[in-house]
Amino acid sequence: YPSGQLILSYRAKQSLEIASLTKIMTCYLIIKLAEELKRNIFDETFDVKEYVEYSTGTTAELIHGDCYTIEQLLYALMLPSGNDAAMSLADWAGGLLNANSDHRENIKVFVKEMNTRCKQLGLKDTRFGNPHGLPHKDTRSTAYDISVLCTKCLDIPLFCRIISTKEYRTTIKTTDNL
């Protein structure tokens, strides 16, 4: 609602598993971190690592060795709900925050930042355990908190452009010179 005023709610504060709604925070945080760290997501690239090919659930079918811009990975995150893209983005951003090359550590750092942002945004009943939303004991939220997060996201032009895209095609670079 444009005024931000709550009109009607039903169990808005009931804590639930949120599955792929987690990717809304992942997308939000990647865009915000890139802005804060002065990174150009249209030019900055990430080489998909081997572990990403073993992602479960829905994926964007990213392939080890392919090179994507961060913008392309955001589309891969949001359009097909790509768990592989979520892991790649978390690895990239966690590496920026942590200056580490270990993907497991980078992803942990990113998830920790997701939870820090929850506090900053006033999402009192939200907690994340991973960047993609696959079942995890720590990943929970409420309809109210998700609505607050979505309202913040709708103020970001790139987020709006991504979620309103019906079809996205891109050219990828490979790192194996083929």
Regions found by a protein language model. Give the residues of each.
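Active-site-adjacent loops and short helices of periplasmic peptidoglycan-processing enzymes
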Residues: 1-144, 148, 153-154
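Extracytoplasmic
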Residues: 145, 150-178
